């Protein structure tokens, strides 16, 4: 199984990259993680967020393959626990070896992307800075992996 995380936004601060890299390193022997950072559409004060999301959707689609199992993070979807994520990872391992987790841009994810997503999940009803979400997702993937492996990291 391979997991790609696609995120939209500007280059994050070093501490974000360091945090993400720590969990990527921990997972690297078993589950390769790939981070794809895409730029957000250019925003203006009088612009249209729907158009921006449509532009971003085109960029996202250019990074997806037909074999990808697209999972989007969506605040309006079901909040899952770490144990539920572990169950999903177990299923992905056997049924969907190319998983893509999408962290949307500041205005959300275009409906065209939502329509092709295989799964929609939420990590919280709270709002987090998008750069921080990549650390949270990487850590949760690692934690879920340790549950599956019986490792004491998750207690």
UniProtKB/Swiss-Prot annotation:
Keywords: Cytoplasm, Methyltransferase, rRNA processing, S-adenosyl-L-methionine, Transferase. Homodimer. It holds the Pfam family SPOUT_MTase. S-adenosyl-L-methionine binds at residues 73, 104, 123-128. It is found in: Cytoplasm. It comes from the Bacteria. The gene is rlmH. GO terms for cellular component: cytoplasm. One of its GO terms (molecular function) is rRNA (pseudouridine-N3-)-methyltransferase activity. Its EC number is 2.1.1.177. This is Ribosomal RNA large subunit methyltransferase H. It catalyses: pseudouridine(1915) in 23S rRNA + S-adenosyl-L-methionine = N(3)-methylpseudouridine(1915) in 23S rRNA + S-adenosyl-L-homocysteine + H(+). SUPFAM superfamilies: alpha/beta knot.
């Amino acid at each position: 199984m391979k997991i790609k995380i696609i995120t939209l936004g500007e280059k994050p601060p070093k501490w974000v990259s360091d945090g993400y890299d720590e969990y990527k390193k921990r997972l690297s022997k078993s589950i390769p993680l790939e981070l794809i950072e895409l730029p957000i559409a250019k925003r203006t004060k009088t612009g249209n967020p729907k158009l921006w999301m449509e532009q971003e959707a085109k960029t996202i689609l250019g990074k997806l393959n037909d074999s990808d199992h697209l999972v989007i993070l969506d605040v309006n979807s079901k909040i899952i626990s770490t144990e539920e994520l572990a169950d999903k990872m177990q299923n992905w391992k056997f049924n969907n070896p190319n998983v893509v987790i999408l962290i949307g841009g500041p205005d959300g994810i275009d409906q065209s992307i939502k329509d092709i997503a295989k799964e929609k999940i939420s990590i919280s009803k709270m709002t987090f800075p998008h750069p921080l979400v990549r650390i949270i997702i990487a850590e949760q993937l690692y934690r879920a992996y340790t549950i599956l492996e019986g490792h004491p990291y998750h207690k």
